[in-house]
């Protein structure tokens, strides 16, 4: 069992990263191998909508995303983690999500990659500063279609409101415990 965590925060030691680390630790407790992808440290350009991926399922842009396709395809479990920026993912996380159009093409158009949808699972961790009732609506919708593109039918989520300061989540051990349990559940299920 291999669990890949995609850390979409633009800064390190963020609330998002702390929760993702807890989830990955929970998965590791259940015997899973884990890998964290810190998108903020990678060079991932936005999708240019050139449709090169419609030809053979590969992206024409050569950057750090080239390696991540293999990481995503080989994962048994995927955790997408992002703070909420204007009711959506960060631009760093969204660039990675948009570039997964190549995987969607492989799966849905070219039929060259057919993952076992029953075996692959996912999770979303989203952290927002406000308490608005629709705070996570955009993130959840984007996550739904990201997970579809990467061959994940079912995903769980941890949505945390009211955190804005760097590493503020450390003052709320219940959120960290929930993230650890999310990782355990993901690895066990």
Language model: regions and residue ranges:
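Glycine-rich phosphate/pyrophosphate-binding loop and the adjoining helix
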Residues: 1, 29-30, 141-189
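N-terminal beta1-alpha1 ligand-phosphate binding loop
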Residues: 1-32
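Residue-level recognition of beta-strand->loop/alpha-helix junctions
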Residues: 7, 38, 158-159
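Short, surface-exposed alpha-helical segments at coil->helix boundaries
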Residues: 17-21, 136-141, 176
């Amino acid at each position: 069992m291999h669990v890949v965590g995609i850390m979409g925060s633009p800064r390190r030691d963020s609330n998002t990263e702390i929760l993702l680390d807890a989830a990955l630790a929970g998965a590791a407790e259940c015997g899973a191998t884990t890998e964290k992808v810190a998108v903020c440290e990678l060079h991932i350009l936005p999708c240019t909508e050139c449709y090169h991926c419609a030809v053979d399922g590969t992206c024409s842009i050569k950057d750090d995303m080239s390696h991540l396709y293999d990481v995503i395809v080989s994962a048994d479990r995927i955790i997408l983690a992002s703070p909420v920026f204007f009711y959506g993912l960060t631009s760093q996380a969204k660039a990675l999500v948009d570039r997964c159009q190549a995987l969607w093409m492989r799966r849905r158009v070219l039929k060259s990659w057919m993952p076992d949808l029953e075996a692959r699972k996912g999770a979303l961790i989203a952290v927002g500063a406000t308490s608005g009732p629709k705070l996570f609506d955009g993130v959840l919708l984007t996550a739904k279609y990201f997970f579809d593109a990467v061959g994940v039918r079912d995903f769980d989520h941890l949505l945390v409101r009211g955190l804005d300061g760097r590493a503020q989540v450390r003052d709320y051990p219940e959120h960290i415990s929930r993230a650890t349990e999310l990782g355990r559940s993901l690895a066990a299920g």
